[in-house]
C-alpha cells in the first residue's frame, strides 16, 4: 500500500478545505487528508459526464460497499479507503454519514433541478454538512452543539459554492437555484442556461445569498466558546467562503460566466495567516456571519 495516495489527491486539489488542514496537528492532518481524498474521489465519480450514468451509479455503489467494509472492521479493497480505515476506527466515523454523502452525490446523477429551498437544503446537508459532521469527529469536541454548528456551516459553504458556480453548472444543464425562487423573481430557466444576467437574476441571487448568510450567522452564534480552539480549521473555512460570498455580492452576482470567480491564493494565504495569528493570541478566529 502506498500511504501517500490520499496526500497526493489532496495536494493536487486547489480546494479551500485542503488549505484549512494547515492548522491541524500532524495526526489529524493525515486523517483529514484521507477523509478529503475519499470525498474527492466519490464526487469525481459522480461528476464525470463522459461516463454513462449507469456506470457511474455502479462505481458509487462499489464505493458504498467498500467504505461499509472499512467501517465494519473488514479490509476495504480501494486504496483510499484502506488509508482512511484506521482513522475511521480512531475517530469512530459512522457509516451512516458516509452513506448520506454518497446519497448526495448520487442525486447529481438523476436530478438537475430543485423545486424548493427545503429540497436544496437537503442536498446541501448531504454533500456538505455531512463532510463537516465527519470532520468535527476528527477535530475532536465535547459539546454536542458542535454538530449543529457543522450542519449550519456546511450549508452556508455549499450555498456559496452554488452561487459561485451558476454559470459553470448551467453548461452541464444544471440549475441548483430553487425553481420556486426563479418563478418568484420571474427568471426563466432558459435565461440561466443561456447565461443571461439581468437585474431579476441579481435579485434572485440576493435571495439565496440571504439564506447563505443566515446559515453563516447561525454557525457563528451556535459555536460554543469552549470549542473555538477545536473548530479553528472549520472556522477558517467559513472565513474563506465568507470572503468569497462578499466578492460575489460586490460583483452584483455576475456569476453566469463559464469561469467561476475565486479568491486568489495570496488572498487565501492572508486569511490563513490572520487566523493563525488570532488563534495564537487567544482571539476568536471567526470573521464570518457578521453585519
At which residue positions do the language-model features occur?
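Catalytic cores of Mg2+-dependent Asp-rich isoprenoid enzymes
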Residues: 1-158, 163, 167-291
Amino acid at each position: 500500500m502506498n500511504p501517500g495516495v490520499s496526500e497526493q489527491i489532496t495536494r493536487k486539489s486547489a480546494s479551500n478545505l485542503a488549505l484549512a488542514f494547515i492548522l491541524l496537528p500532524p495526526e489529524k492532518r493525515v486523517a483529514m487528508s484521507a477523509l478529503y481524498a475519499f470525498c474527492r474521489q466519490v464526487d469525481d465519480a459522480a461528476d464525470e459526464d463522459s461516463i454513462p450514468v449507469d456506470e457511474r451509479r455502479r462505481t458509487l455503489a462499489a464505493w458504498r460497499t467498500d467504505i461499509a467494509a472499512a467501517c465494519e472492521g473488514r479490509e476495504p479493497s480501494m486504496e483510499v479507503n484502506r488509508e482512511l480505515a484506521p482513522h475511521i476506527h480512531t475517530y469512530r466515523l459512522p457509516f451512516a454519514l458516509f452513506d448520506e454523502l454518497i446519497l448526495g452525490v448520487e442525486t447529481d446523477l438523476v436530478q438537475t433541478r430543485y423545486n424548493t429551498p427545503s429540497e436544496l437544503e437537503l442536498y446541501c446537508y448531504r454533500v456538505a454538512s455531512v463532510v463537516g459532521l465527519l470532520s468535527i469527529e476528527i477535530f475532536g469536541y465535547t459539546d454536542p452543539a458542535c454538530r449543529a454548528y457543522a450542519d449550519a456551516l456546511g450549508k452556508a459553504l455549499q450555498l456559496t459554492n452554488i452561487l459561485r458556480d451558476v454559470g459553470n453548472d448551467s453548461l452541464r444543464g444544471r440549475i441548483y437555484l430553487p425553481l420556486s425562487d426563479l418563478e418568484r423573481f420571474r427568471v426563466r430557466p432558459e435565461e440561466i442556461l443561456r447565461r443571461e444576467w439581468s437585474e431579476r437574476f441579481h435579485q434572485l441571487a440576493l435571495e439565496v445569498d440571504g439564506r447563505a448568510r443566515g446559515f453563516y450567522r447561525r454557525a457563528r452564534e451556535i459555536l460554543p466558546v469552549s470549542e473555538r480552539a477545536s473548530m479553528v480549521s472549520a472556522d477558517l473555512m467559513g472565513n474563506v467562503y465568507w470572503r468569497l460570498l462578499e466578492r460575489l455580492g460586490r460583483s452584483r452576482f455576475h456569476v453566469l460566466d463559464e469561469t467561476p470567480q475565486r479568491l486568489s491564493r495570496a488572498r487565501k494565504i492572508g486569511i490563513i495567516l490572520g487566523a493563525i495569528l488570532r488563534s495564537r493570541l487567544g482571539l476568536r478566529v471567526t470573521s464570518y456571519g457578521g453585519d
